[in-house]
């Protein structure tokens, strides 16, 4: 509703959007599309109701929801002890013809966890967003950070080889200490908590890391390759609106409101502002309220409302 209203210079309280259950998307279907605006313009000029019909093949060959087309140049600066002193990323991000939905925002979102789990004092992000005649890009299997995390973690592996350090050890030397939180990373976002060394230790123990390295050594003696991947990443669970200023997004929060009512028979109705997306959000809401009121989960009914009736909301997306 916000996006549609912004295009026509109409305040949000004058736009009524009725969402429908739309299958799994993890937020990828939450943005505005060009066809939405076309429909509204057609309705305004023609004066008659307009229906947009699009099948799966049409969407797959002309709609958003495509994976990234990113071109990276990146480097790490380290001292002789394996401590990272700087991280630089130059990214050319091809968002296709229209960058529907959250395309440009996904380019900025890596700033929310730019230096990952590591205490890297300085960082640089040179971001160029381009439009081409390709299909529109949008959030897909993670809203921006996954390719960035891949680049950072590969650089950590390269550095480990050059310094003849174990991949786990170089990461351990660079983790943000657990007693340093809350911690502000170089891009300006604040982490509230974390114990990355304990998480690494748990993974190494569960995977019997030493035994894996022995197996790898024996395999190479026999002319076989056994790969072992070690990765430590952070996936931002909400949004860093400071980063979104890069692409002109407003610095608002991400509220999620709900209206709860209890009838004479002890049944609960909760009204939310988002439709089903296929990840079981309504089940979670029902379980939380059933536990809180001490009732059966079947005694809770979840209803989604239109944008004018619902409390302040954002809806599922961005790993939240």
Residue ranges: model-predicted function:
Residues 1-320:
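Structural alpha/beta core scaffold segments of enzyme domains
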């Amino acid at each position: 509703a916000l996006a549609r209203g912004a295009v026509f210079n109409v305040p949000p309280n004058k736009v009524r959007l009725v969402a429908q259950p739309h299958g799994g998307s993890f937020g990828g279907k939450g943005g505005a599309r060009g066809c939405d605006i076309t429909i509204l313009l057609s309705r305004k000029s023609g004066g008659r109701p307009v229906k947009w019909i699009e099948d799966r093949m049409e969407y797959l060959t002309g709609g958003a929801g495509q994976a990234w087309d990113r071109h990276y140049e990146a480097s790490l600066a380290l001292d002789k002890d394996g401590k990272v002193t700087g991280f630089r990323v130059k990214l050319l991000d091809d968002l296709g013809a229209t960058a529907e939905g959250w395309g440009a925002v996904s380019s900025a979102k890596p700033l929310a966890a730019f230096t990952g789990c590591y205490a890297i004092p300085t960082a640089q992000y040179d971001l160029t967003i381009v439009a081409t005649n390709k299909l529109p890009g949008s959030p897909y299997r993670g809203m921006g950070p996954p390719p960035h995390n891949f680049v950072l973690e590969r650089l950590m592996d390269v550095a480990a080889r050059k310094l003849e350090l174990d991949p786990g050890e170089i990461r351990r030397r660079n983790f943000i200490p657990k007693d340093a939180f809350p911690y502000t990373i170089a891009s300006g976002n604040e982490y509230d908590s974390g114990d990355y060394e304990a998480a690494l230790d748990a993974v190494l123990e569960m995977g019997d890391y030493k035994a894996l390295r022995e197996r790898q050594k024996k395999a190479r003696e026999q002319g076989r390759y056994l790969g072992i991947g070690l990765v430590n990443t952070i996936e931002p669970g909400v949004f860093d609106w400071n980063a979104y200023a890069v692409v002109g997004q407003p610095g608002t929060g991400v509220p999620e409101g709900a209206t709860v009512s209890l009838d004479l028979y002890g049944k609960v109705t909760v009204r939310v502002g988002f439709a089903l997306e296929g990840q079981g959000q309504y089940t979670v809401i029902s379980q939380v309220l059933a536990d809180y009121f001490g009732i059966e989960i079947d005694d809770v009914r979840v209803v989604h409302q239109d944008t004018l009736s619902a409390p302040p909301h954002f809806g599922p997306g961005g790993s939240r």
